[in-house]
Amino acid sequence: VKRPMNAFMVWSQHERRKIMDQWPDMHNAEISKRLGRRWELLQDSEKIPFVKEADGLLLKHMADYPNYKYRP
C-alpha cells in the first residue's frame, strides 16, 4: 500500500506536467530540483489548497487502511 501524497507531492504532480510540456527533453532530476525551489518560494497562503487536498487524502487513506503502518 502506498503512502498518501503530501502537499508538495500534490502540487508537484500538477506542476511537473506543465514543465514537461514546456521542456519535454529536460531530465527528471532537473525537473525535481526546479520544483523544489519553486515550492520553497511559494507563500504559505499559496500552499493552502494543496495542504487541504493532502489532508483529505490522508483522512481517506486512514479510513481505507485503518491498521496501516509505514514500513520502508
Curated annotation (Swiss-Prot):
InterPro entries: HMG_box_dom (IPR009071), HMG_box_dom_sf (IPR036910), SRY-related_HMG-box_TF-like (IPR050140). Pfam families: HMG_box (PF00505). GO terms for biological process: brain development; camera-type eye morphogenesis; negative regulation of transcription by RNA polymerase II; neuron differentiation. The keyword DNA-binding applies. It comes from the Eukaryota. The keyword Nucleus applies. GO terms for molecular function: DNA-binding transcription activator activity, RNA polymerase II-specific; RNA polymerase II cis-regulatory region sequence-specific DNA binding. This is SRY-related protein ADW4. It comes from Alligator mississippiensis (American alligator).
